[in-house]
Amino acid sequence: MTWRATVLTLFPEMFPGPLGVSLAGRALASGLWGLEARDIRDSATDRHRSVDDTPAGGGPGMVLRADVLAAAIDAVDAAADRPRLVMSPRGRPLTQARVAELAAGPGPLIVCGRFEGIDQRVIDARGLEEVSIGDYVLSGGEIAAMALIDACVRLLPGVMGKLESSTDESFSAGLLEYPQYTRPQTFEGRPIPEVLLSGDHGKVAAWRLGEAEALTRARRPDLWAARPAQTIRAKGESQKTPKNKTDG
């Protein structure tokens, strides 16, 4: 079954947008994944195609109505057999581990909010998982949805040209990615580190690991704090590996 993302939005014309070019775009054109953008207004019941109303209790802005959004969700995912997400700054932070889980499934239904937000009752009634891509606020969920979809698509079979390209990137091993270099060998007096030109794969791997660890310690202490537990588990598992028995 082809991985497929369905997006509920007030602006379906925003899609595929950046997802239609480069790596994701080529994969989309090749049928390695699918995308459907549905207009929430199609589920409105009045002649004005109204989808929002004023906040209960007062306050600025407008709120997406639960009845309209529920109808939109039910129209495309009545069986509720895949993840249902809503992009929200108050949601759980999106991690590479969660991206891998989503990429391994059938593809999510993603709700993109606008205005002041979404009626909480539809979030509860339809089991929407609130997901955040960062501690900041966007005008709507569409750009956040594109980021999530792009992160998933690059993990799908056949999308990346080389398997190691995805497994060596930031977060795939709990570390930020090491620095990358290419020609020219010297740029404005700054040379490529000699070890990368040595041809010694062991030394190159050790250098890259050291750089990744140093960057993670300095820039993401939260990731580094979780690293020792992963290392201890890995060592424990290696110690449990049975030794080869000799005949006789």
Swiss-Prot record:
> Could you tell me which residues belong to the region Disordered?
226-248
Task: Name the predominant localization.
Answer: cytoplasm
Residues that, per the record, bind S-adenosyl-L-methionine: G113, I133, G134, D135, Y136, V137, L138
The transmembrane residues are: none
Function, in words: Specifically methylates guanosine-37 in various tRNAs.
Q: Which family does it belong to?
A: Belongs to the RNA methyltransferase TrmD family.
Can you name this protein?
tRNA (guanine-N(1)-)-methyltransferase
